[in-house]
UniProtKB/Swiss-Prot annotation:
<feature type="compositionally biased region" description="Basic and acidic residues">
    <location>
        <begin position="266"/>
        <end position="276"/>
    </location>
</feature>
<feature type="compositionally biased region" description="Basic and acidic residues">
    <location>
        <begin position="303"/>
        <end position="320"/>
    </location>
</feature>
<feature type="binding site">
    <location>
        <begin position="566"/>
        <end position="569"/>
    </location>
    <ligand>
        <name>GTP</name>
    </ligand>
</feature>
<dbReference type="GO" id="GO:0005829">
    <property type="term" value="C:cytosol"/>
</dbReference>
<keyword id="KW-0342">GTP-binding</keyword>
<feature type="binding site">
    <location>
        <begin position="466"/>
        <end position="473"/>
    </location>
    <ligand>
        <name>GTP</name>
    </ligand>
</feature>
<feature type="region of interest" description="G2">
    <location>
        <begin position="491"/>
        <end position="495"/>
    </location>
</feature>
<dbReference type="InterPro" id="IPR053905">
    <property type="entry name" value="EF-G-like_DII"/>
</dbReference>
<feature type="compositionally biased region" description="Polar residues">
    <location>
        <begin position="46"/>
        <end position="60"/>
    </location>
</feature>
<keyword id="KW-0547">Nucleotide-binding</keyword>
<dbReference type="InterPro" id="IPR036925">
    <property type="entry name" value="TIF_IF2_dom3_sf"/>
</dbReference>
<feature type="region of interest" description="G5">
    <location>
        <begin position="602"/>
        <end position="604"/>
    </location>
</feature>
<feature type="region of interest" description="Disordered">
    <location>
        <begin position="33"/>
        <end position="370"/>
    </location>
</feature>
<feature type="region of interest" description="G1">
    <location>
        <begin position="466"/>
        <end position="473"/>
    </location>
</feature>
<feature type="region of interest" description="G3">
    <location>
        <begin position="512"/>
        <end position="515"/>
    </location>
</feature>
<dbReference type="InterPro" id="IPR000178">
    <property type="entry name" value="TF_IF2_bacterial-like"/>
</dbReference>
<feature type="region of interest" description="G4">
    <location>
        <begin position="566"/>
        <end position="569"/>
    </location>
</feature>
Length: 956
């Protein structure tokens, strides 16, 4: 069956929700509010009760209730004949509805007079019900007074019997609580309409009386209704009293059972603790007592009232907890007011009302089996060991105490103590091998981390080496079909390049290294990462110094050498001479019984290039080059530079594993995450397999060319390793600082007299910076040395100019340009910036500057010789010597020496030179003149005067 909510029923029959709720409660239905739902039959029953004029909860089957209903019907017929007819018509209809339980239907025509009379009767009934509730509350107060020893029941009954009839009185009774004020305000409006209806009814009754209608005794009727209602309320009070007594008894019984359970739990817990105390020793007992939770054995004070009981006591009158009951609320409030002094001592929240319940028993720790092996490290605490072997720290403290070691759970233990402890437990102890996470070199020396099942063949890495302008870049350019050589300044390769080509379905990685003498370190670096070396030699030049150097690098790296004799198309080419010259340095052709392959090529005209590539693949197959692409990537930095928009850019050669974008990486003393990755063609890639050259961005600083790199598990580990490596490098640099001792004291003092040329080097790539700095430091000029104040990659900026001004240095830019702000600041601060693109021109210019830094060297040049013939003494002027030039000439600005008896008695400058009375600049051979010498007046006859000048000589 369908259900209806009470507010829907109220809307259908035109009543308020409150009236419908009260009517449903009076009919014995279990409802709480206007939102409660009832069955269809109960809904019809509620609607029928309003149609029949029922005012109270009348139980079905009660004979007395039927009698009251009959009396109401008779009184209604006697009072109003015409409305009685309508009531009589409604009563059978209501009876029919109760029998068949149909849905109430509104009549087609409304009888307003009958409706007003019905509302007036309902108001009278509600007033009477309110009066009865007031009487009930007074009766409850009397019962409460008797329980507290106040013995006021008889006086209360007397006042109740003497109280006048208040059925039509609008004043509230004194027994209502403060919520009655809201009910009184609502009753005033109802009383106004009731008075108006009463006046209309009185007018109608007068008309009926005049017409001869019988008179009705209202007092007798009201007294009968009141007596019946009082009897019903008395029965309800008796029923509530019995329910309350039963609830008290059940609550007392539950409290006694809870106390018994708590006492039993305490007894069992006490027995358990006594048994454990007897089984263990005193030290273990004390440790266990600190861990175990104590049980609260305090007894609750008897004079403290149970607030939870007081709160629930008023709700045990047969109603729900969330129902409103005027009697129960007043009773609880009075009880609280009477015990206000005791409640002050025990103001606990509602969460503490069940504080006397039995404590939960302490659950025993789950038993765990001991591990078979235990890997420990120095300095582990007792708590850490306990956590690893799944035991209590107190248990380990006890074992250590029995072993003679006093320790707490936070105390560190040495390795011997940990091993003895593990022996006591029967566990095999192993010391943990500490791995230096910052050490990248271990990946290159130990290949135990590689999985043999995942090892596959990789592409060979080939390095092209040779002398300057022997055709290395031209050969690589021919292989890649590009024109790199034309873009290189001066026709020489400035920095290393890495490229990858494909031949016969297989990839080959080529490294191009510079051949200039300044790039020795770059050639050595290229040989260290290569698998095969192609030594290119020009057929017309033969073996050159850098050719021999490349041979030595390849032999030191232990890699096979393939000799490519280039420029065989040129006139004067002599390959046989090249083969014989190489044999002198240990490079013997297979045709001569050696191990080196020789191929005659012409890189310019693409001759025998395929044969060279086939030879490379053949040698690679013999070498069995393998790699594991599944591990984390490791490799070497080929080149590094600082890009204005991208930051630090490093060219890496992957040697093991696969490098991915977003991998955390440590490169030398720097770290970061691979932000972007491009191949040799400038295209973006997401991964790089072994033997693949790529350029990456995302490093915090520019690394050094030749540094190793490794990928770490996460960025946190990579950052820690990078910072540790940078710290170690700084510490090593500080340790290398030379200290002054007695042995090098003279050298230190002598070095203070040596002049220095301060330079700041900025280049496009890191390899060029290294080569340029090394070349400048090798310049040998006596008395002058080069001091590299700062070297870095990238454009010349304002900070470089500021540093140059502070250190009086010259800025040298190699393949870079200064920013506009830096150029403007350099002009303002008078800082010299030299820009170059060819390295040997830089070396020549710096060497000239170093030579110019030395003090000039002077050489004496004799001009002439004169003899004093006569002397003249002039007062206030000095002695004037008359002379004759016997050799050469005497000039005005020349220096002179006075020689007497072959001894130089004075060396100085001329104060004046005259020919007769005229001042002249010089006096020639066999001429006479007069002179005065500054600061010397002791000129005598026959003194010899030598005239000379000091001329600066050029250093070679």
């Amino acid at each position: 069956m369908s259900k209806k909510r009470l507010h829907e029923i109220a809307k259908e029959i035109g009543k308020s929700s409150k009236e419908v709720v009260e009517r449903a409660k009076s009919l014995g239905l279990d409802v709480k509010s206007h939102a409660s739902s009832v069955e269809e039959a109960d809904a019809n029953k509620i609607a029928s009760s309003f149609s029949a004029g029922v005012t109270k909860n009348v139980q079905a089957g009660s004979a007395k209730d039927k009698q009251v209903a009959e009396q109401k019907a008779k009184a209604a017929k006697a009072t109003t004949p015409q409305p009685a007819a309508s009531k009589a018509a409604e009563k059978p209809a209501a009876a029919t509805q109760e029998a068949s339980q149909p849905v109430a239907v509104k009549p087609k025509s409304r009888n307003f007079k009958a409706e007003r009379e019905a509302r007036a009767k309902e108001q009278v009934a509600r007033r009477q019900a309110g009066q009865n509730r007031s009487n009930d509350r007074k009766s409850d107060y009397r019962q409460l007074g008797r329980s507290q020893g106040q013995q006021t029941e008889r006086a209360g009954h007397k006042s109740q019997n003497q109280q006048r009839d208040r059925r039509f009185d609008n004043r509230p009774s004194s027994g209502n609580n403060r919520n009655d004020g809201h009910r009184q305000a609502g009753n005033r409006d109802k009383n106004r309409s009731f008075n108006a209806n009463s006046r209309q009814q009185d007018t109608g009754r007068q008309g009926q009386t005049q017409a001869g209608a019988p008179k009705i005794d209202f007092k007798a009727r009201a007294a009968a209704l009141k007596a019946e209602q009082n009897a019903e309320y008395a029965r309800q009070r008796e029923s509530r009293f019995r329910e309350q007594e039963e609830a008290k008894r059940l609550e007392q019984q539950a409290r006694q059972e809870a106390k018994a359970a708590a006492l039993k739990a305490q007894t069992e817990d006490k027995k358990h603790r006594e048994a454990s105390a007897k089984a263990t020793e005193s030290v273990a007992s004390m440790a266990a007592a600190s861990v175990a939770k104590p049980v609260d054995k305090r007894r609750k004070k008897q004079n403290r009232p149970d607030k939870g009981h007081d709160r629930d006591h008023g709700l045990e009158d047969g109603q729900k907890k969330n129902k409103k009951s005027w009697n129960s609320q007043n009773q609880v409030r009075n009880q609280k007011n009477s015990n206000w002094n005791n409640n002050k001592k025990n103001k606990k929240g509602k969460h503490h009302k069940n504080s006397n319940t039995a404590p939960k028993p302490v659950t025993e720790r789950k038993f765990h089996e001991l591990p078979k092996e235990f890997e420990y490290s120095e300095g582990m605490t007792v708590a850490e060991i306990a956590k690893r072997i799944k035991r209590e720290p107190a248990e380990i403290v006890k074992k250590l105490f029995m072993m003679g070691v006093m320790a707490t759970q936070n105390q560190s233990l040495d390795g011997d103590t940990i091993e003895l402890l593990m022996v006591d437990y029967g566990i095999e102890a192993k010391a943990k091998v500490e791995v230096d996470e910052a050490d990248i070199e271990r990946f290159f020396t130990d290949d135990s981390y590689l999985n043999p099942e995942n090892i596959v063949e990789r592409a060979p890495v080939v390095t092209i080496m040779g002398h300057v302008d022997h055709g290395k870049t031209t050969l690589l350019d021919t292989l890649r079909n590009s024109r790199v050589a034309t873009g290189e300044a001066g026709g020489i390769t400035q920095h290393i390049g890495a490229y990858q080509i494909e031949e016969a379905g297989k990839k080959i990685t080529f490294l191009d290294t510079p051949g200039h003498a300044a790039f020795t370190s770059m050639r050595a670096r290229g040989a260290s990462v290569t698998d095969i070396t192609i030594l290119i030699v020009a057929a017309d030049d033969g073996v050159m110094p850098q050719t021999i150097e490349a041979i030595n690098h390849s032999k030191a790296a232990g890699v096979p050498i393939i000799v490519a004799i280039n420029k065989i198309d040129k006139p004067g080419a002599n390959p046989e001479r090249v083969i014989s010259e190489l044999a002198e340095h240990g490079i013997i052709s297979t045709a001569w019984g050696g191990e080196c392959e020789f191929v005659e090529i012409s890189a310019k005209f693409n001759k025998n290039i395929d044969e060279l590539l086939e030879t490379v693949l053949l040698v690679a197959e013999v070498e069995e080059l393998k790699a594991d692409p599944t591990v984390r990537a490791i490799g070497t930095v080929i080149e590094a530079r600082l890009d204005k928009g991208k930051g630090a850019v490093a060219t890496l050669l992957v040697q093991q594993g696969t490098l991915h974008v977003q991998d955390p990486i440590v490169v030398g003393n720097t770290f970061g995450r691979v932000r972007a990755m491009t191949n040799d063609l400038g295209r973006r890639v997401k991964s790089a397999e072994p033997s693949t050259p790529v350029s990456i961005t995302g490093l915090n600083e520019t690394p050094m060319a030749g540094d190793h790199f490794a990928v770490y598990a996460d960025e946190k580990a990579a950052r820690a390793a990078g910072e540790e490596r940078a710290k170690r490098a700084l510490l090593k640099q500080r340790q290398n600082t030379q200290r002054v001792s007695l042995d090098n004291l003279f050298d230190t003092l002598k070095a203070g007299e040596i002049k220095t040329v301060n330079v700041i080097i900025k280049a496009d790539v890191q390899g060029s910076v290294e080569a340029l700095a090394a070349s400048l430091l090798k310049i040998d000029v006596e008395g002058v040395r080069v001091n590299v104040v700062h070297s870095a990659v990238g454009a010349i900026n304002e900070s470089d100019v500021t540093l140059a001004e502070a250190s009086n240095a010259v800025i040298i830019g190699f393949n870079v340009r200064p920013t506009p702000q830096a150029r403007q600041q350099a002009d303002t601060d008078d800082v010299e910036i030299r820009l170059h693109s060819i390295i040997y021109k830089v070396i020549e210019e710096v060497e000239e500057a170093m030579k110019g830094k030395l003090d000039p060297e002077y050489q004496e040049k004799m001009l002439g010789e004169a003899i004093i013939r006569e002397t003249f003494k002039v007062s206030k002027v000095g002695t004037i010597g008359g002379f004759m030039v016997v050799n050469g000439k005497v000039t005005r600005d020349s220096s002179v020496r006075v020689i007497r008896d072959s001894v130089v008695i004075f060396d100085g400058k001329l104060a004046s030179l005259k020919h007769y009375k005229d001042d002249v600049k010089e006096i020639g051979n066999a001429q006479e003149g007069g002179l005065m010498i500054e600061g010397f007046n002791d000129i005598k006859v026959d003194d010899t005067i030598e005239a000379y000048v000091m001329e600066e000589i050029t250093r070679k």
